From Swiss-Prot:
Residues 1062-1072 have a biased composition (Polar residues). This is Coiled-coil and C2 domain-containing protein 2A. Gene3D superfamilies: C2 domain (2.60.40.150). It is found in: Cytoplasm; Cytoplasm, Cytoskeleton, Cilium basal body. Keywords: Cell projection, Ciliopathy, Cilium, Cilium biogenesis/degradation, Coiled coil, Cytoplasm, Cytoskeleton, Disease variant, Joubert syndrome, Meckel syndrome, Retinitis pigmentosa. It comes from Homo sapiens (Human). Residues 220-230 have a biased composition (Acidic residues). Part of the tectonic-like complex (also named B9 complex).
Amino acid sequence: MNPREEKVKIITEEFIENDEDADMGRQNKNSKVRRQPRKKQPPTAVPKEMVSEKSHLGNPQEPVQEEPKTRLLSMTVRRGPRSLPPIPSTSRTGFAEFSMRGRMREKLQAARSKAESALLQEIPTPRPRRLRSPSKKELETEFGTEPGKEVERTQQEVDSQSYSRVKFHDSARKIKPKPQVPPGFPSAEEAYNFFTFNFDPEPEGSEEKPKARHRAGTNQEEEEGEEEEPPAQGGGKEMDEEELLNGDDAEDFLLGLDHVADDFVAVRPADYESIHDRLQMEREMLFIPSRQTVPTYKKLPENVQPRFLEDEGLYTGVRPEVARTNQNIMENRLLMQDPERRWFGDDGRILALPNPIKPFPSRPPVLTQEQSIKAELETLYKKAVKYVHSSQHVIRSGDPPGNFQLDIDISGLIFTHHPCFSREHVLAAKLAQLYDQYLARHQRNKAKFLTDKLQALRNAVQTGLDPEKPHQSLDTIQKTINEYKSEIRQTRKFRDAEQEKDRTLLKTIIKVWKEMKSLREFQRFTNTPLKLVLRKEKADQKADEEAYEAEIQAEISELLEEHTEEYAQKMEEYRTSLQQWKAWRKVQRAKKKKRKQAAEEHPGDEIAEPYPEEDLVKPSPPEPTDRAVIEQEVRERAAQSRRRPWEPTLVPELSLAGSVTPNDQCPRAEVSRREDVKKRSVYLKVLFNNKEVSRTVSRPLGADFRVHFGQIFNLQIVNWPESLTLQVYETVGHSSPTLLAEVFLPIPETTVVTGRAPTEEVEFSSNQHVTLDHEGVGSGVPFSFEADGSNQLTLMTSGKVSHSVAWAIGENGIPLIPPLSQQNIGFRSALKKADAISSIGTSGLTDMKKLAKWAAESKLDPNDPNNAPLMQLISVATSGESYVPDFFRLEQLQQEFNFVSDQELNRSKRFRLLHLRSQEVPEFRNYKQVPVYDREIMEKVFQDYEKRLRDRNVIETKEHIDTHRAIVAKYLQQVRESVINRFLIAKQYFLLADMIVEEEVPNISILGLSLFKLAEQKRPLRPRRKGRKKVTAQNLSDGDIKLLVNIVRAYDIPVRKPAVSKFQQPSRSSRMFSEKHAASPSTYSPTHNADYPLGQVLVRPFVEVSFQRTVCHTTTAEGPNPSWNEELELPFRAPNGDYSTASLQSVKDVVFINIFDEVLHDVLEDDRERGSGIHTRIERHWLGCVKMPFSTIYFQARIDGTFKIDIPPVLLGYSKERNMILERGFDSVRSLSEGSYITLFITIEPQLVPGESIREKFESQEDEKLLQATEKFQAECALKFPNRQCLTTVIDISGKTVFITRYLKPLNPPQELLNVYPNNLQATAELVARYVSLIPFLPDTVSFGGICDLWSTSDQFLDLLAGDEEEHAVLLCNYFLSLGKKAWLLMGNAIPEGPTAYVLTWEQGRYLIWNPCSGHFYGQFDTFCPLKNVGCLIGPDNIWFNIQRYESPLRINFDVTRPKLWKSFFSRSLPYPGLSSVQPEELIYQRSDKAAAAELQDRIEKILKEKIMDWRPRHLTRWNRYCTSTLRHFLPLLEKSQGEDVEDDHRAELLKQLGDYRFSGFPLHMPYSEVKPLIDAVYSTGVHNIDVPNVEFALAVYIHPYPKNVLSVWIYVASLIRNR
């Protein structure tokens, strides 16, 4: 018995011995047990499916006894790589047991035959292996198996495990005794292989019989309980295995089950591929070019003969040497790859460039000392010999002797500019020069030539070449037509440029002539006799229209065809890019899916992130061609460059038919100029080889600045002329002559003799700077034709000299020319070899016609690269006029040295980021730390910028809530960008101090002062102020700038008031204006308040300063008049870290100076502990604030003064009444103003230098004389009082200069305001002032970055709902004028605004000063008036400048009728011309929308409540709805009474409704512009900082709408604490 039969026998014996025990075990099982595929289980889980369940018919104790066996089975199966599925069990006996035994015998009998056949095929190798199928073998490359093939690797691991288990099973089999197997039963090994072996599939015919027997022996219940195993990865199916493991003798079987191979793979012979098949497959896949010579006819188009350019005399260059075999291979490959034969030339050879390698090296090789140096390579040193350049001009001994003569004819001189030119002479010279250009262009008529050429080319394209000619193919015809089309495009471009030049030149001539005429009319005299006449030539309009339309249609069709071709090309590129993008996206998805699968298979492992790749952007399809757009472009271009059919042809004619105004009719300055011209004379010196040989006579300078000499100089010479020079000298009166310029004359050719020499003109210029005190414009000095000095010109002295130079002719008719020496001939012949241009003579380069003639006679090859520069120079010079581009290239070889293409550079994200930063785009201005690589730059960097470009015309209402204000903000942004772009170039200038930071070098005066100071007596009690050092913006960074706020003292702080006290005051309406504003102390003497016990603290105020969310506060003082004298320091951070001047000027941050009252509350609950402990809580109550914009501090450098505190009209728990004893001294100083005040000193450390305003000249429609008068008026005022503000002209919103009085005109206020107090003019004026103050304030320094100050008209101001002090003041002044008041616009300086605008009115015999931004008014002698000095007053018809000694409003007289006090602009010498106003005739107001205001009110209230809750993240915020409702009903009363006389009633109402609460709150009133200022104002009050546990809040918002969408916003914020 062989070993294979022994294995089968052992398995059969073990199976029979355990048969009885297995029957008993089946009775204890359920009717069916679920089968499951065998898989690896975790060692801690015991699979319940493997354990026998309790039988319904058996003893319940039996499964307990068999538990060790069951656990052994479970543990054994757990350790293996697979688990056997349990066989279905049944509870039936008798026939069921017999049928089960029969089925098992049949199965074992069938399995034994299969196992024997499988074992016969087993190869006795030490390790079972599996051969891959040929289909899988093809997937393997020479670099290894493909990464996606997981099946093969899994099979190898399974084979490795099977090998180890087979070895263990063999060793176990040798130890165990081999029981005898009854005949007819399989052995143990056969039984094991039957259940665990993977059999290879057999032919279908041999498999059908076992399957049939298997079906016959299986009942219906067993078929339902069986499950199919999923197909294995090796390709075959694993058979189901039945669990037959019960009984004591199953240990053998279990021991073998754990370590036996689960498959045996059949081994087949390896696949073999014959060499013949492999060669055949390579022939099909690869192309091997032939080495045979290709006939010439195959390399040329059909019916085309080869053309040899070298035989035709054209230069072709030397081709590089290539082996003939390689050429044949390449030719065969190209013919197969490209059948169109584009790689072959006309001669049938492959196109090749000339060999670029030089025949000899440019430098000798560097040899080491060990290497031998050949004699040919040794360096030969020769001493340098100085070359005598003048030897070619010296007559040598070998030359024939004789006298030679050169004739120089100087006919005259004309100045194209002279210092004595008047402005009219400048225009006349320009007009004459333009007219000469016109005549020259008209004579050439290049536009007509190009038009004819364009028509001929179009005819050639339409006709086409004759296709019947045998020597022309379709490719050649198409190539020729493409060349024609390209030439048509170029010719059309040149034609349009020429026509535009002609039209522009004609327009310029007419413009200069009009300027000349207007100048003559302005100056009322004439200096030049020039006269221009425009002659109209009528043409056939119908024919012109037809030709015009035909040309446009032809151009449209050509452009349409070009765009169609371009669109097809772009579409092809788009398809290619789209395919690439789709392929890339597919690869990315596959990678993503693979990473996801790897993460699911290995959830605990960290998967390395792949290297970031550049994302491909999905390409966009090109836009199709639009005929309408092309037609519009063609018609616009034609309208610019061509004459329209209905326009006549204008022919200018310039003549000297005019008359010059005599001296007696000219002003004194012009007479002085003419007399100065008469004093001047001119003469010329003639220099030969830098030696003076003669000079002309001195001729006086004519009135037309022409000088006629008419002299011929005969120079007897013996040497060749090296140089001929004329020096122009000018003499003024009896002074010494002055050299103006030198004129270098060309040396004539030997063929130029006297009598045939043409007269030529040579230009000259001078660099002298001459300034004159008369009407002469000077030389090298800027001057202007404008009255305001704009558009300045700087002209230098220049002119032309008419002359001719020729060789003289002797008596015998022989020219007296020095002959060329032999040495000179040799020298020129040597030059001819090196340079072709040098061999044609010295003057050959100056005469291009001679140069072209010489090139034609010498028959130069135009295709020779050595002659390319010369041929290009000749073609440009002989074409009449070349096309001069509008640019020049700094680096002509830039494209050759580019590292990447322009397209790739534009795709670079880093380059784009750098480019946007250099352009100062707002999103990237001052952007720092740009990454080095593109992959490190995220796409989201450009999201904001691209979104802004996309949403350029989209109105975003998210930040503004109100749609109208969103539109206004968008419009202001566009105006801001327009202004910034306009002044961007003008701002690019720097002072020396901006670029160089250095200490000033002390001079003798500074040193002297320092020495004197050392000797001065020191006075410590009176220190002197030292000037602070100023710094510039580029030296700053975060943390360098500090904001210093010095809190000095405060006056009349509201004091605490018991809740029970009430005051009876008359109502506001019952008090007259005279009572309110009388200056008597009795009106303001308060009654003594007896509610406070003696010695009780009235108020404990402290000041808190917040800036950029940084908060500092002072110590707590006591009393209503506290004194702190403390300095607070706050850091300043510029937006985006940009400390440039423009960035600092546009900062919108505000400094909030809040005054709080510190209140101590006793919170000790048990009075028994009051003697032993103190428990108090500090609360702070907001009393008022002062707001200071940072822009004001930045421009003023320091703010010093006393400011009124903005105290809410209702301050619960506090009273504004003062104590008689404490306030008696202070009341005597008070006049008209009420309120609380605080003294501050604010500055920036270090001191910053604000940018200087750019004084640019703007367009203006004002009269020129008026603008000149304004400049003169401002200059006179600034000369006497340089620090006072004088304003005569302003810039409107369109960028034009407007006289300032045009802005003042009576304009009607809203009728709704006039109806409130119909009989009280003063109350109406206050209401109108309050309406103006409700319009939001927006300084121009913030809007336009300090560039300029734009003035808008009143209707524009009301539409924009934003403006600075000037717009508010103009609107208020216009309202007052309409009310019949005497009102002026007052320009001066105020605190804290700086230069500002107020309104001055005359009321009941006294002057009142109105602040338009706050709506308050002050008396002239009010010490608390914020206006500190007065510069000028502006009325509707005049301007008055303050020329008084004092400038404070307290000390000046406002009577403008006194000329000694006020300097008026319009006077007797300059009467008022009756200027029209730029304001509209009347203002149209839209009715207020109360529904929109109510909706806006609810949204703002919701936003503020959310903000307060966000500001209290650690505390719960409770809202008292009852109190909120009470406050909401109270706010309309505040708006109606303007916040006056309602405090007591409101306090009583709150005490009545909320008596058990301690209430602290206040209303805030602001004009509405946007939400952010409202949020900042609420935040600055600190109402959210209360951390009492049982605190409740109330917030109410009320918006009252006024006409023109002006909104008044009231915000009532309160905190409530329940009394214990």
